[in-house]
Design a protein with these regions (language model features):
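Alpha-solenoid helical repeat scaffolds
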Residues: 1-179, 186-238
């Protein structure tokens, strides 16, 4: 019964929107009516028009539109809206909203753009989870210094879902920073072996680093022996 009434009122409401294109209330009613009739694509389209005409002003409306862009797999557009409206303070300055902006940029594979909102969300968070994600984002950018710093802080802040993985990632970032960080990387990998779900991966890393260190030590000893042999004149004059 209600669906029939909605169907009957639809042509009139569509005509009103066409005749009064600046009337916000008609657009809002039409978007809601399309949603009631399970015409989600049409409802989304009307909300896009409303945003382009600055008819969406409330936090919930703006957030809903951004979430619809994410649902329709247009994360870049969602990120643009979230970024603009967070800066304008029409979307609330809250951890979950900054995290959603970061998620939108990450979904769009815009790692660098995800870093500022993810940093804000992490600073608002009570645990280390978002700092760990921030470290992983820096890893995507191959910024090993900042990756290591944020992962280390995530471990320090604690309450992580998977601390063993955090130690593993810390080891990887330290290893990427070069030979002089190898021992600290080895320490992190050994810490990671203490967690059942990470033990196998961490032990592989431990073996790789210890094998590299053993080869370098063998090369060093061989070089020292060669130098000693060259310096020993008695080899050649006896």
């Amino acid at each position: 019964l209600f669906d029939d009434r909605y169907e009957e009122s639809l042509p009139l409401l569509e005509a009103m929107v066409y005749r009064f294109p600046e009337k916000k209330s008609y657009h809002r009613q039409l978007a809601a009516l399309y949603a009631e009739l399970k015409r989600e694509d049409d409802s989304f389209y009307i909300q896009q028009i409303m945003y382009s005409k600055d008819m969406l002003e409330k936090h919930a409306e703006l957030l809903r539109l951004a979430q619809l862009y994410l649902y329709y797999e247009v994360p870049y557009k969602a990120a643009l809206i979230l970024e603009k409206e967070l800066e304008a303070e029409r979307i609330k300055d809250e951890e979950k909203n900054w995290e959603q902006l970061a998620n939108a940029w990450l979904s769009a594979r815009e790692w660098k753009k995800a870093i500022p909102p993810l940093t804000k969300a992490a600073e608002m968070s009570e645990d280390g989870g978002l700092f760990l994600r921030l470290g992983q984002t820096y890893m995507q950018e191959e910024d090993w210094k900042n990756a290591e710093k944020n992962i280390r802080y995530a471990i320090k802040k604690g309450d992580l879902d998977n601390p063993g993985r955090a130690w593993l990632l810390l080891g990887i970032t330290r290893n990427k920073k070069g030979i002089k960080f190898e021992n600290s990387a080895l320490f992190a990998f050994k810490r990671s072996t203490g967690y059942d779900d990470m033990e196998a991966d961490a032990r592989r890393w431990v073996k790789v680093i210890e094998a590299k260190q053993a080869r370098r030590e063998a090369d060093r000893l061989a070089a020292e022996a060669a130098e000693a042999e060259l310096a020993d004149d008695t080899i050649y004059f006896n």
